[in-house]
């Protein structure tokens, strides 16, 4: 629901988040989800389990180096819930945790159990120049269960790109060399940032 507000349009020239795209991130499963962000601001609200923290964690996963990345900040300080989310749990699509009494352990259920890819794309706009796209693409092989098993690549592009454009180059593994044609001036290899040359 959009509420009418008599606020001035934010000044052009300020870089603002304009769109978030998610593919196979948490319970955002099976297609590319697009969330346009209003230039005046956006309120993220919904019931428990509706994906609010997953969306915010996706944005953080693109903008924050792994060594400082703390997922599920909304639950931090909530004891056991604070450690339930990781890059692997998001790439795999963890949706349930149950207790296995026979083995005396907690077991996660996943939407994606085999080899899988995941993508997060953030498009920023200033209103005066071309958009800037930041993306992080992940591939997790079948059987991979730790963050060390994830291959990922980060993209910085000075134009609007779409997750559809890069999906073929991460669906079966991160293929940086093949990623270059849709992002022609990209540099880098798996595990490092890809930047477009100025």
Label every PLM stretch briefly.
Residues 1-195:
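Extreme N-terminal "head/tail" segments of very large remodeling/mechanoenzyme assemblies
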């Amino acid at each position: 629901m959009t509420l009418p507000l008599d606020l001035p349009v934010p000044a052009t020239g300020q870089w603002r988040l304009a769109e978030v795209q998610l593919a196979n991130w948490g319970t955002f499963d099976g297609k590319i989800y697009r969330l346009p962000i209003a230039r005046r601001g956006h309120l993220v609200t919904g019931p428990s389990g509706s994906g609010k923290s997953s969306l915010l964690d996706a944005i953080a996963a693109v903008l924050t180096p792994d060594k400082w990345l703390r997922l599920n900040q909304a639950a931090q300080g909530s004891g056991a819930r604070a450690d339930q989310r990781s890059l692997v749990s998001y790439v795999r699509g963890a949706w349930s945790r149950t207790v296995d009494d026979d083995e005396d352990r907690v077991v996660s259920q996943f939407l994606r159990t085999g080899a899988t890819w995941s993508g997060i794309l953030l498009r920023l706009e200033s209103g005066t120049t071309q958009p800037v796209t930041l993306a992080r693409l992940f591939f997790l092989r079948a059987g991979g269960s730790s963050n060390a098993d994830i291959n990922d690549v980060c993209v910085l592009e000075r134009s609007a790109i779409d997750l559809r454009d890069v999906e073929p180059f991460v669906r079966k593994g991160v293929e940086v060399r093949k990623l270059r044609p849709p992002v022609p001036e990209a540099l880098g290899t798996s595990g490092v940032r890809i930047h477009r040359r100025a």
